[in-house]
Amino acid sequence: MDYDLFQSDDEEILATFIQATQKQETLSAQIDVDDSEEDLVDGLHLPEFNCSGRDTLKSQLCEGGFLGNGYAQLDPPRSRLDYLCFDFAPAQLAVGAVRNYLYGEACKNVQKLLTVVMGQQHLQATAASMNSGWYRVRQQVTHFYHLMLLLRGNELLPSHFLDGFRQLLNDQLDADTWKVLYFAEHNKGNDCQAPAYHLYHGVLEWRFLDLHILYASGNDQAFLGQLERTLDDLIVCAGHHYRSKHRSELIHSSPFMCRCNKELWLLLKRLIPKWLGERELDFWTLFHKAMQRHKSLHFQGESNAISLAYHELYSWLRLGLARLDEYNSEGWYQPDHSPLTAAPESFQTASLLKQFLASQPDEQQRRVYLIQLSPLQLQLGKPDTDVLCQLWEYFHRSLNCNFSVGTELDQLPLTCSNGSAYVDRYNKLLSKSHIEDLNLSSFTMYAWMLGKTLKLLPSQGRSNQRQKLLGRIFSKFSAAKLLALNEPGIHHVIELFLCLLLCHEDLSELAPKLREMLLCLALEKLPPVRRILVAKGHMALLLLHAQHRLSMDDYVSKLLNQLATIRNDAEVGAIYVGSLQAIFNLADDFNRGEQQLLGPWLAHYVEKCGQASQDRVWQTLHNLILRLSERRAVAGNASGIKEALQQHIMPLVRTQYVSSHSSWLPKLAANFIALENNGDKLLLGFLQGPEPINMAASAQLLLQVLEDGGRPASSTILQVWVKSLVLLNAQHESVLALMPHVTQLEEFRLLAIDPTSLEGGREPLCAFFGALGRRAQQEEAAAHVRMQLSHKLHAYVNHFELWLPPDRSRSELGSRFYSFLAIVIYNCSTLAYVRSKPSCFFHLAMVRFLLTTQLQAGVPPEGRLPQVVHKIFPVLLQGIGRLPYRTDAYVAKTLEQLVQHWTPHFSFSSNAKLVARPYATLLQADVDGELAQFVLQLLVTQFLVVQRRRAGQHAGLVITIMQQLIESTGKEQEEQLLTVLRGVHIPLLEHVMFVDEVDLSRNQVFGLYKVLISHDAYKRSQAVRDMCSNHLRSLAEKHLAHCTYFYFQMLINLAELAPDLVAPILSFIREQAEQVELKRGAGEDVGIRKCLQRLQKVLSRV
């Protein structure tokens, strides 16, 4: 609205009147003024309202206002006449005509402001030129009131002046006018040029000054009527202000449009008790009557919506007025320095609450109302227990409701995650002196208000009212009602109980009663979701028992009995577990029944829950055991806790140590070892039992024991180190952490291991067992020394057969483990093998891993095991080669079985060179060739035997291996070729002799011969050729008499391939043939002669 519509044009009238009055003689016109000079305050500026914009809850009042200038007194200060803004001398103001003129001007100025504000357009032309003059117009009226206040004791002051003026304002300021005026605030203050601003603030000033003048007149009836009219107008302004707000804004907004409006309310609140004196009326009584009049005029109707709107305005304005007491006499906001002792009846909280609740408010309306009610109960006045009783009567019928307003805010979790969270939440809530959070449900606000009130009542000497209030609450909780609660209802009961307990210093009386009420919610009678909620409530109460050092024996026993009735339900158990850490942390001497929490239910829960939940249990138990060494615990019931741990938790830890991946279990096992008198025995029990699925468990356990100050045996440390190197690797953090402890051992230092061999990515196992083996092979090492070293080796690898889990044998871990077997056998075979001792490393390695019953029965090995054994095979053979394999029947048999059962499985690749690699590596590594020859003899003996002229299943594989051995031999490696031939040449020729002519292996052997005779070493070495010839001679001597045809067939085929090999022995063959004929005694044998002729014919062709 454009307020600049009017400008006064009375200058000529004013000038004329001044001239007329100046011509009068001063002495004849003067009126004797009753006020004496000494009653006037020199230098006092006339107060006025100077706006600073919208009011806030804690805004300071204007220093130059009425309150700061002493106008809250019955007899306000008086100023000199020359401070008034009129164009008259002070003496002229005493002239009756002047006062008549000023009265007329005041009436006219008010009409100007009213007219322009209400928008009469015909005044627009004159208003445009007065933009800067509305403040002057308002000020002249205000100063007229100051003049009247100054002359209020003068008997000649016409009473009709103010009566008419008052009537003018009362007639013009109706509801429509206030609807335009109520928001006419501005942060520029009196520099604002809007006429509505000056009319609004002028009316506030005029009404206030008029009340002062009217009170001084002694007309009580008129004064009380005008006071009521002023309150009515102020409430109308507040009503318009209320309608401009959303409901949620009310809790953070001031009910006063600006601080000028607030200051007028505050002035009236301070003056009314002085004005009314001994009368039965006071400010709050007048206010409540004014609100009733406001309701009849502006909230007409019987609907709940109208009633609720009225009560919202009522509670908002009532709170704002109550907070005015937080301002001091100078207008400064000082809530901490203002004594607030208003009686409950002043606010009429109980009666108004009853009307509000009867109007069926929704949840948001309840929340806003309770936020505005709580300061009246707790900060601004004494608590009214009737209010809490009314609210309980209202809420207890709705416990099963969600108290939701249906907005996104209410999608936040209703319940807490566990008992600790419940206690923390309501501790934090009750620590607040006031609440303004609309996310809290109305029931939560009630519980908070109830708790705060119960805490406040004893300090006011009203303990009996607290007991009555508690009795009123408890009377509503029967067992049947508790069992009828749904999930929200149980949550509400929990938060109610917690608010009651948290506000009591001594829980010894209240806690047992509440826990028994909660125990009425028997778990077996509830569905799963409600069980969980009840369990959270129990844990919250149990925590409070622990905090206040109350006995928990009976309570815990009943809780665990209820848990047992539902078969130790894991979800309920999880709630119990969630509070264990907090309960144990609060225990100092463990004398209040904490040991009962370490029962079978906990083991049942751990077996059912997931890894993360288990870890929380382990961490809790770890922290608990650490606390048992504290002085107060030792003096208390630490022994009872230890007994419970040993009885119920130790068996659980043993099984979980093996079956769980948790890194907490090694720490917990170390804790139990520290508790034991014979800790070393328990340590060995963990280390030598079934291997944990957590491969680092042994190292982690040992490290924890060492960190705890334990001193395990050197062999134990080395065993764990070796096992960790096998199951993990040298770069694993646990192995690296263990290494400093290992290198400090005397046993380790005696091996004189080069430290660099343990670094740089090398395999420490090779260095360690290599050094151990070299120590045993030293010439000066006596038999008993070697025996001691053997014992140490077996201690280092104790129970190694348990290290590799069956399900991991085909993984990378399996490869590392089989490599470990090969490393030990290669480096320490003489220590690993003990004759006639089935438990020695060598025997166990064979029967459990390398020569298993399944393998010997013909069951193919699974997965990548053939590749793994293929890789370590030459190392194994070399290690066995250091044993007396020719004289020790067991070793010889083992070697034979390794060749027999594993060679067929080396055909996993079509790459012949790869397949033959184990034997090729052995051939190259065996310097004297003795072992290689022995192994090759075993190989051909096993697989080249011919039965019924048919080759064995794996003959082709072995022939291929032999051919690869020949091909891989360098031209300078005559000895290697001789080794091969010594081992396989004769069996190969015999295979050709006796196998069927159509068998593939026969052609394979001839193909091998082609490779042999084309080999550079064969061509260059006479010894190789001589050996081949000698083998042919030996075969002639052996087979010519009985297998004449087979021998000559083989020889003829060789002659076709290598005539140079056969030709030199032709004469020997002839002589052997003649010898056979002589032995037979039948003369020349036609068959032999024909074979000789064919052989000669073949040689002659070549």
Curated annotation (Swiss-Prot):
InterPro entries according to UniProt: ARM-type_fold, MMS22-like, MMS22L_C, MMS22L_N
Domain of life: Eukaryota
GO biological process: chromatin organization; double-strand break repair via homologous recombination; replication fork processing
Primary location group: nucleus
Signal peptide: none
Record's GO cellular component terms: nuclear replication fork
Key words, A-Z: Chromatin regulator, Chromosome, DNA damage, DNA repair, Nucleus
Key word DNA damage present: yes
Compartments where located: Nucleus; Chromosome
Family as reported in the entry's similarity comment: Belongs to the MMS22 family. MMS22L subfamily.
Protein name per its UniProtKB record: Protein MMS22-like
Species, as recorded: Drosophila melanogaster
